[in-house]
């Protein structure tokens, strides 16, 4: 068994790294309407979830022990309101020696968790359970490594 350690990337080249991750949260139609109409008691769900996702991307190496601290150059969290829920798409870019998919995964995951937290009051049934609410399909939809003149 090997010891836990951060992988040595010192000999790798600095290149442009990009990762795009999406995830989905299924919500009740009534909750979606509250989000659209900005009637959620905790505030603007879209703005808060985007902000949480961006912050999460920046905090990834503090949350996931073996992640390298990467100087992120771009983080975008897009949230699309769909018929049965919200889709979160996070894009992260950096010129570095290792990929940024963990940062994009973290951004999407935390944005989805933030949405759940902000609307949980409206999602509970009469027993305080969440029979309809579901976070699903968190996946890397694109990972790009672009070689340019950065070294």
Curated annotation (Swiss-Prot):
Catalytic residues (positions): 117
Catalytic activity: (8S)-3',8-cyclo-7,8-dihydroguanosine 5'-triphosphate = cyclic pyranopterin phosphate + diphosphate
A family per Pfam: MoaC
Pathway(s) where this gene product acts: Cofactor biosynthesis; molybdopterin biosynthesis
Enzyme Commission number(s) from the entry: 4.6.1.17
Transmembrane feature ranges: none
Classification via CDD domains: MoaC_A
Binding site for substrate: 66-68, 102-103
InterPro entries: Mo_CF_biosynth-C_arc, MoaC, MoaC_sf, MoCo_biosynth_MoaA/MoaC, Mopterin_CF_biosynth-C_dom
GO biological process, one term: Mo-molybdopterin cofactor biosynthetic process
Keywords: Lyase, Molybdenum cofactor biosynthesis
Keyword Secreted applies: no
Record-linked SUPFAM superfamilies: Molybdenum cofactor biosynthesis protein C, MoaC
Principal EC category: lyase
GO molecular function, a single term: GTP 3',8'-cyclase activity
Database matches in PANTHER family: MOLYBDENUM COFACTOR BIOSYNTHESIS PROTEIN 1, MOLYBDOPTERIN COFACTOR SYNTHESIS PROTEIN A
Subunit-structure text: Homohexamer; trimer of dimers.
Family: Belongs to the MoaC family.
Function: Catalyzes the conversion of (8S)-3',8-cyclo-7,8-dihydroguanosine 5'-triphosphate to cyclic pyranopterin monophosphate (cPMP).
Descriptive protein name: Probable cyclic pyranopterin monophosphate synthase
